[in-house]
Amino acid sequence: MRFADTNVLLYAISRDPAEQDKAKRANDILAGRDLALSVQVLQELYVQATRASRPDALSHRQAVLLIESFRRFPVQDLTTGIMMAALDARQRFQLPYWDAAIIEAARAMGCTDVLSEDLSDSQDYGGVRVVNPFR
């Protein structure tokens, strides 16, 4: 199973003409069935998608409906176990905490790949590998 980072979801809803290739790729990814998310990813999506400075900002209601639609995928809750593993991974791999939390949520879901444009492509974090799907 693959784990999608927030940027995959954000590209899927982008109306920016400069991001249309990435939007198509993101929607192709979301059409698959082998995908997992986390509560953190959905929270970040809400914050970024409704940001007033975003040219194509969603309303609260639109964002809630979008998040509900993404619940068709398995979603990893944030637990104290994941938080503690992320704190460990932060130290071990010298990652920002929020990136480590993504890696550890993916691991908890049994994912071997994290689809992300924000983390280092091809980097392996103890059996969880980052893949940039937009390269």
Regions found by a protein language model. Name each.
Residues 1, 103-135:
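Acidic, PIN/NYN-like endoribonuclease modules and their adjacent C-terminal/linker elements
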Residues 1-37, 52-61, 65:
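Short, well-structured N-terminal submotif of metal-dependent ribonuclease cores
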Residues 10-14, 49-53, 71-74, 90:
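Short amphipathic alpha-helical interaction patches enriched in hydrophobic/aromatic residues
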Residues 37-40, 116:
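Substrate-recognition element of Asp-dependent hydrolases with the DxDx(T/V) motif
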Residues 41-42, 62, 82, 102:
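Short, conserved alpha-helical segments within structured domains
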Residues 72-114:
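Active-site neighborhoods of divalent-metal-dependent phosphate/nucleic-acid chemistry enzymes
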